[in-house]
Amino acid sequence: MLFRSPSFNDLYYQEVGNSKLKPENARQYNIGLTYSRNVCTFLPYLSATVDAYYNKVTDKIIAYPTKNLAVWSMRNLGSVEIKGIDATGSLSLQPWESIRINFSGNYTYQRALDVTTPDASSNKSTYKHQIAYTPRVSASGQAGIETPWIDLSYSFLFSGKRYALGQNIPENRLASYSDHSISAGRDFRIRKVTTSLSVEVLNLLDKNYEIVQFFPMPGRSVRATLKIRY
């Protein structure tokens, strides 16, 4: 049995806080398998992990949109059942001594259902519906190459469809989305000063998507970062 008290912000933060929040209680069951080894000089690192879990949560503390969708508030969700599978993997290749290629990724399938006893007086039951803003399927991945001259990387993030409110009905549905980014960076050392320069292209494909309903994310953008250490 796990116990989580609401934080100070959960209780009292302006407009968001809810001083009537109850502590969250959970029973968690988990089984997992991990494999990791150094295979050879060319494949110095290989790792894979699979976890399956089942959680039964009472008075789950969640952030929930109010009538004004720009303002969210904390609330308790009476009873939630969460079950799912997480899979992660990573490997490194070293074709030459000074060059390393890295890959990693993860996949999550999660059913997080509101199993609170339905209110007979309400015609808006959310019983056995996926809780708000929780996709059943999500994934991410990264690939990168490290060289003495420059470091290059690519990353992506995928989220399946979600629902903006507790009812899983078409008008509350948010479409799935994917986000891709690339970056390049290099370190320069002059005497005792190390300078790091990196350039990133975010939302590479310039996709229109929303993480929160009615709040579109920025389109393609470029960000440059310069760090000096001495």
Residue ranges and their predicted role:
Residues M1-N30, Y45-A48, A52-N76, G160-Q167, ...:
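Surface-exposed extracellular loop regions of Gram-negative outer-membrane beta-barrel proteins
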Residues G17-P23, N38-C40, S73-S79, L93, ...:
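Outer-membrane beta-barrel proteins
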Residues E24, T34-F42, S90-W96, G144-P148, ...:
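Structural signature of outer-membrane beta-barrel channels/translocons
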Residues N25-Y29, E81-I85, I99, Y133-A139, ...:
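Residues that define the transmembrane beta-barrel architecture of outer-membrane proteins
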Residues N30-T34, T88, P218-Y230:
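Outer-membrane beta-barrel "beta-signal"
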Residues Y45-K56, S73-L165, T194, L205:
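Gram-negative outer-membrane beta-barrel transporters
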Residues S178-V199:
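C-terminal structured "cap/appendage" subdomains that terminate the fold
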Residues V201-N203:
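Gly/Thr-rich phosphate-binding loop signature of adenosyl cofactor/nucleotide-binding cores
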